[in-house]
From Swiss-Prot:
The gene is csdB. It catalyses: 4-hydroxyphenylacetate + H(+) = 4-methylphenol + CO2; 3,4-dihydroxyphenylacetate + H(+) = 4-methylcatechol + CO2. It comes from Clostridium scatologenes. One of its GO terms (cellular component) is cytosol. This is 4-hydroxyphenylacetate decarboxylase glycyl radical subunit. Heterooctamer consisting of 4 large (HpdB) subunits and 4 small (HpdC) subunits, arranged as a tetramer of heterodimers. Also forms a catalytically inactive homodimer. Residues 35-770 form the PFL domain.
Length: 897
């Protein structure tokens, strides 16, 4: 063995790795998921996404029975009733229980949030036809046709939003439940008052052109991190006792707050009601398990039911006494919050750090083994994967792609600034490798203090092609926290508690003292409302298109923006006009969104979430009245960043710098799709397919010049300077506008799946992209097929600005499986991540998959029911993703070394 090998062997041994493994083509086999997991996953794969009216009925009934009650208490009673009356469903082999509804993949409508669609379509629904699209964004959004989606009606099932199936006998209940909300739902009240804003007509034009993807009221909660501290520390009976004490202390007392002081008593009364509802919900599961055990003849399943009876009976009243009870308690609270509102992105946070004290004691006492803990973690993944969001097709398909972004973060720093990695987090990764489900997605908060063996474990998981874990720069996240929340008192301790809310939204947190097993452990959790309910997904290439067409949308023939009537005789004139349209867009959309969210918080204030989030209970204020510790959390979401930047680069180079063409010639070529058929005609939504028309020769020179213009992602200063200038402009621009909390907006850069529908409504762009094809994905990913100088050149381009300026930055990369084979491949993958993090990059995620496999799966989806891919901050089953996004994922540049 030579000296070089000896040194490598020493290094590997110090990391607990055998030298022989470095040369193996494959690493150790991953154990199969537990039998209980496999049986329940077999059931999951057969299920359809089902909407029913049980929860909505009880909410509606209780709401109207309490007409005249104080609004906070009325709301809490209604939510509590919807939980406590839900039919408890327990499947054989389950060890963790509870779901959103009585159905495993269940969801339900929220007519008190949005009733107009159901009321307007009552006749169509009663006549047993597919519910039509609600708006323009719905009509151009595509939901995956496979898996559990119900894309069309059949038999006794009606399709709603091209995703949810509802039994025909439920439709009359839906119609009757929706009727009382006519004119007074959050949606309709918002519309009423939004019409009073001076820019309302402009707002409608923007929404109808799909420049903005959807309204805030559609998913008013989520994109935040839940906090499990209260029930883990006190238990439900303990919380009820605390509520009684607080009611006695503050009822009738305003303190020194003349605005909200008197409302503290009503807040605690509401918290008592919702806690009673959560307790009753758990009690119902305990009773159901007891009954099932009494009739079960299989001894193993009977023992499961008896254990469920014990666990659910205990957590219905007492704080958790062991790991099993603690993880079940977190599920109860999680389902409680996601049932309050239509929402996505209620993230789990740093669960492995929250539950570490319970795990540690059980292992030390011999109560559970690591394998038994892994089984519960595998089953936990199924529970989270079953969470569905009842929303329109535009939200379900065009934004979420069927995922609900329940992100679980790993690593980072603890309260004292040391590595926060716990032994339980190794098992969480292991469970994600064994039971490969879309949720919860995993995110590593990469820190220089993170143990090397944990990073290697996480990289081994990423290699499997599951799309998780993704990798975040912990230091950049902390810097953003201090920058954005410093004015609200954020200190270094709280900055260390941050993690991801939703797919990629940096969310503030705090540490709280959990007393358990004779110790006090500072556990992290969320400390803010939603971090993603602002200006939702502005298609920046579309705005640029309308600059070139004088505000006229040539696709629809509508005058979207006021004509600027300017001669675009310089690059600066064009960009300044884009800025004017962008600021007009932000102004009118933000005003209307503020009204929507203000109406929501006045009538639909969170109940469960306002119990859990610090410092609501301490202040006696719900989330809507800024009870949470941090409230500067409302964002401006962008889409198509790199398509936009590359378009600017092309126009600047070809029109203004080199004078190859006039701006009129460039615009004409774009309006004529460079002489090619559009994606509307070909039904191919990625740039790798072009079908010529008889006009193609007319535009071939200009098309070639557009394709060959400098592109972002190649460490090319020409394009990168445009990219950098954009970021400093958008930072200043977003901070000019205020949220309904009176705090500045900030930039959120996640495409999610909106680059599909927003690309669909956008004509050809100056970078050579054709009409109707998807925008570039992410925000710092190179546009597919344009990165010519390798991954490290993309890293150079991506880090020309400070990533802590914004809430996030999204980097998607696709690797061929052969590029990361064996232990050496794992090391290469980790080195790639580390290189980007050290340059200041915020986020990177990987698809490790062969494009040939994806193409075959697109043609024969029935053969690939379990295939998952990374889309944009989340993983989803391939067959449940719409074709435009499938095409985009296939066409992403694939690196094989």
């Amino acid at each position: 063995m030579n000296v070089k090998e000896t040194k490598l062997e020493d290094v590997l041994k110090s990391r607990g790795i055998d030298m022989k493994d470095a040369y193996n083509i494959s690493e150790a086999d991953i154990p199969e998921a537990k039998e209980s997991t496999q049986k329940l996953m077999d059931i999951y794969y057969t299920l359809k996404v089902t909407a029913d009216m049980e929860a909505a009925y009880w909410y509606n009934r209780t709401w109207w029975e309490n007409d005249g009650e104080v609004i906070e208490v009325r709301r809490a009673k209604a939510v509590a009733a919807s939980l406590s009356h839900m039919t408890p469903t327990i499947l054989p082999y389950e060890k963790l229980v509870m779901n959103k509804t009585k159905n495993v993949r269940g969801a339900f409508p929220f007519p008190w949030v949005c009733a107009s669609f159901f009321n307007a379509q009552a006749e169509a629904l009663m006549n047993e036809v597919d519910a039509p699209a609600e708006n323009e964004a719905d009509s151009v959004s595509v939901v995956g046709a496979g898996g559990g989606n119900v894309t069309e009606s059949y038999g006794n099932v009606i399709s709603i939003a091209k995703k949810f199936g509802m039994r025909k006998e439920e439709i009359p209940v839906l119609v009757k439940t929706s009727k009382p909300w006519e004119g007074i739902s959050v949606e309709e009240l918002s519309n009423k008052y939004s019409k009073m804003t001076p820019g309302y007509d402009q707002f409608k034009n923007i929404m109808e052109s799909v420049i903005c993807m959807f309204d805030s009221f559609a998913i008013p909660q989520g994109r935040e991190v839940i906090n499990y501290y209260m029930p883990l520390q006190y238990g439900f009976d303990g919380i009820i006792k605390l509520c009684d004490e607080k009611i006695a202390e503050v009822m009738g007392e305003a303190g020194d707050d003349g605005d909200f002081g008197m409302s503290r008593g009503y807040y605690y009364a509401a918290m008592k009601e919702i806690t009673k509802g959560l307790s009753a919900w758990c009690e119902n599961y305990s009773k159901r398990a007891k009954y099932l055990a009494s009739i079960e003849t299989d001894s193993e399943i009977k023992a499961n039911y008896e254990k469920i009876e014990e666990v659910m009976g205990n957590i219905a009243h007492k704080k958790p006494a062991n790991f099993w009870e603690a993880i079940q308690m977190t599920l109860c609270c999680h389902f409680g919050v996601v049932n309050e509102d239509p929402q996505s992105g209620l993230s789990i946070g740093r669960l492995g750090q929250v539950l570490q004290p319970f795990y540690e004691k059980d292992v030390e006492d011999g109560i559970m083994t690591d394998e038994e803990v892994i089984e519960l973690l595998e089953l936990y993944r199924i529970k989270i994967t079953c969470i569905e969001c009842f929303a329109s097709a535009g939200v379900s398909g065009g934004v979420l792609s069927g995922n609900t972004f329940n992100n679980l973060s790993l690593g980072g720093q603890n309260y004292d600034g040391l590595s926060a990695v716990t032994p339980l987090e190794y098992l969480i990764v292991e469970a994600g490798m064994r039971n490969q489900t879309p949720q919860p997605t995993l995110s590593v908060l990469y820190d220089e203090k993170t143990p090397e063996d944990f990073l290697m474990k996480a990289a081994s998981c990423t290699k499997l092609g599951l799309g998780y874990p993704a990798w975040m720069n912990n230091q950049t996240g902390m810097n953003f926290m201090m920058r954005n929340y410093g004015p609200e008192g954020m200190d270094l301790h709280d900055a260390r508690a941050w993690c991801l809310g939703g797919c990629l939204e940096s969310a503030p947190g705090c540490f709280l003292p959990l007393e358990y097993n004779g110790k006090v452990t500072m556990i992290p959790g969320g400390a803010s409302p939603t971090c993603g309910t602002g200006v939702h997904f502005i298609g920046m290439p579309k705005v640029l298109e309308l600059v070139l067409t004088n505000g006229l949308d040539k696709r629809t023939g509508k005058q979207v923006y006021p004509p600027h009537n300017k001669k675009l005789d310089s690059y600066e004139t064009m960009v300044n006009q884009w800025k004017e349209y962008m600021e007009l867009t932000t102004d009118v959309v933000n005003r209307c969104n503020n009204i929507q969210m203000d109406i929501w918080r006045k009538y639909n204030m969170p109940a469960v979430n306002s119990l859990l989030k610090p410092d609501c209970f301490k202040k006696g204020k719900h989330i809507g009245t800024m009870g949470a510790r941090y409230n500067s959390c409302i964002n401006f979401e962008s889409c198509g960043t790199i398509t936009f930047v590359n378009s600017l680069s092309s126009i600047k180079k070809n029109v203004f710098d080199d004078s190859k063409f006039t701006i009129e010639e460039m615009t004409d070529a774009m309006l004529n799709n460079f002489g090619f058929k559009t994606a509307y005609e070909t039904e191919v939504f990625s740039p790798d397919f072009r079908e010529s028309t008889d006009k193609s020769t007319k535009y071939e020179k200009i098309f070639a010049a557009c394709v060959n213009a400098p592109k972002y992602g190649n460490a090319d200063k020409y394009a990168d300077e445009i990219f950098k200038a954009y970021h400093y402009y958008i930072y200043d621009m977003t901070h000019k506008f205020r949220s309904y909390y009176g705090k500045p907006l900030y930039l959120c850069q996640i495409s999610v799946s909106t680059h599909g529908p927003q690309g669909f409504v956008t004509l050809a762009t100056a970078d050579g992209r054709l009409a109707g094809t998807t925008y570039s994905d992410g925000s710092v990913s190179a546009a597919a097929g344009t990165d010519k100088n390798g991954i490290y050149a993309i890293f150079e381009s991506a880090t020309v600005y400070d990533h802590s300026m914004h809430q996030n930055a999204q980097m998607n990369l696709k690797l061929h499986p052969t590029a990361v084979k064996g232990i050496n491949g794992t090391r290469k993958l980790l080195d790639l991540v580390r290189a980007y993090m050290r340059k200041g990059g915020f986020h990177v995620q990987f698809n490790v998959v062969d494009s040939k496999t994806l193409r075959d799966a697109q043609l024969t989806p029935e053969k690939y029911r379990e295939l998952m891919v990374r889309v944009a901050g989340f993983t989803q089953y391939w067959c449940e993703i719409g074709k435009p996004i499938q095409d985009e994922v296939i066409y992403r540049t694939e690196y094989d070394k």
